[in-house]
C-alpha cells in the first residue's frame, strides 16, 4: 500500500481488525520511511458497478464519494458513525444485488434519501435539496409536507396494528 504522505510503496500493517458491523477490515499502517500512520479499509466487492449520470456519461461507482456526500448532509448532526457506515454498507450491498452493473445516479440518489430518512430528517432534507436541485422555498415546503405525510401514515399504521392485536387478544376462544 502506498504511503499517502511520502509515496513510499513499503508500508507495514500494525493492527488489523473487523469493523463493528463486520462488513470491512480496518488496518492501521505505518510507513518505515517517513513514520506516517494511516488507516485503510478492505471491503468485499461483488461486482464492478458503473454509474450512469444524468448526462449519459458512465463513471465507476465510488463508495468514498457516496460516503462524502452523506457526511456533508449529516454535518453537525448527532448521528453515530457506525450507524452511517451500516447504512452505506447496506446500500452498496443493495446496489450490488440489483443484478445490473450499470445503475443510474437517480436510483442511487433515491436509495440514499430513503436511508437518510431512516437516520435523520434534517440530513434527509439537506441531501434532497441538493439532489433534487431545490430553487425556491416552495420546494422545501413540498418535501416537508411529504415527510410529515409519511410520518402520519406510519403512525396510523402502528395504531391499526395495535388495535388489531388488542382485538385478537380479547376474542373468545
From Swiss-Prot:
A zinc finger (unnamed) spans 3-34. GO terms for biological process: negative regulation of DNA-templated transcription. The keyword Zinc-finger applies. Negatively regulates transcription of bacterial ribonucleotide reductase nrd genes and operons by binding to NrdR-boxes. It holds the Pfam family ATP-cone. One of its GO terms (molecular function) is ATP binding. NCBIfam families: transcriptional regulator NrdR. Keywords: ATP-binding, DNA-binding, Metal-binding, Nucleotide-binding, Repressor, Transcription, Transcription regulation, Zinc, Zinc-finger. This is Transcriptional repressor NrdR. Binds 1 zinc ion. Its cofactor is Zn(2+). It comes from the Bacteria. PANTHER family: TRANSCRIPTIONAL REPRESSOR NRDR (PTHR30455:SF2). Residues 49-139 form the ATP-cone domain. InterPro entries: ATP-cone_dom, NrdR-like_N, RNR_NrdR-like.
